[in-house]
From Swiss-Prot:
The gene is murD. ATP binds at G113, S114, N115, A116, K117, S118, T119. This is UDP-N-acetylmuramoylalanine--D-glutamate ligase. The lineage of its organism: Bacteria, Pseudomonadati, Pseudomonadota, Gammaproteobacteria, Oceanospirillales. Cell wall formation. Catalyzes the addition of glutamate to the nucleotide precursor UDP-N-acetylmuramoyl-L-alanine (UMA). Its EC number is 6.3.2.9.
Amino acid sequence: MAKDGFDLVIGLGVTGRSVIRYLTDQGMPVRAIDTRAEPVGLDALCADFPDLKVHTGGFKKGWMGKARRLIVSPGVAVSTPAIAEQVVDGKEVIGDIELFARAASEPLVAITGSNAKSTVTTLLGQVADACGMNPGIGGNLGVPALELLDDQARLYVLELSSFQLETTYSLSAEVATVLNVSQDHLDRYASFADYLAAKQRVYDGCQVAVWNRDDLATRPPATVARQISFGAHPEADYRLDSENGQLLCRGEPLLSLSELALTGHHNAMNILSVLAISDALSLNRDKALATVKTFTGLPHRCQLVAESGGVRWFNDSKATNVGATLAALTGIGESIEGKVILVAGGLGKGQDFSPLAEPARQYLRAALLMGEDRTTVAQGMSAAPCELVADMAVAVRRAHALAQPGDAVLLSPACASFDQYSGFAARGDDFTTRAQELCHD
């Protein structure tokens, strides 16, 4: 073992703590670093691992140099100078998903994309469970991947972020998918091309690639021998036939849209991707169809949270990028008789908001924009009727005043939440509480 022979875990969030637990169980010497002076949960971690050496408040150069390898949490960029220096020196720098891939013995489905990852991961997990696979479901969603290894799973279903894929080298999934790609995390990546390259790593070594024929950025490399596509495109293997209201597999009807609990184009795409993956895994199709029919979605994802006076209120707080808001605005705008009042804004992450301009013109009664980058969002939406508001309380009251019977009020921020909230869930809960209070008055 090289040098002092310890693994250095960088970042003490949920992922970092799972890595420490895993390596300690393997009998590996471990040390840990967090650039925060007082990481949340540090006292509990030290109580659980009293022999663990921890440095906080920055990088400890001596440890960085002596460690045999670095295990970097997703929230820490490999391009950070202190880490990049170790890469240049030839040190192994990996993440928790790489450790998982080296240890897992059962088939893996790897799911990434700018949007819908959690929905597709959850629904596929439900399908696999209905088929008796006892799936291990997690990764970027819920349970850290390494904590799934002891669950006697016959199949792993992992949601993976671009950050996790950056430090993963031997994934070799049974089925891998990039659901969609739109601008996101441009505050971390030098360019959209770099972000796309990180997403495309999910296909490395996979047996089957499932991709979105409506989004060519998701297309896998030609080196993947077996490729299955989904989408509204006429040549998609699993296709949405909007004209006849059906989902098809190579021209044969699977089910009617009227049979689904979920509505909207984006939800049809999610269900098609799940059915494509399920078939690629040779899961029971009848059980898969029965499961997708009754799926009602996840919290904070186009979730109907209130209804009063002919106005419906939707919480889509998980929409932290333009692509997600575009899908929600189009899906809801197409499905209602009235107009949409959009509540958006927050931390823009360097995105281009101009793709929202056309659907905003078509579907919006008004956009109520809050948060640090609200002016930037308004500029991107150009001619759309925009109002700048101070916070969620003002936005909800104003939406209530503007809404007419047949309208929908949609919280779909297209931005991160950390300028005003602890996360997207707190933002969505704030919207939901205020909407329900108004509707019950």
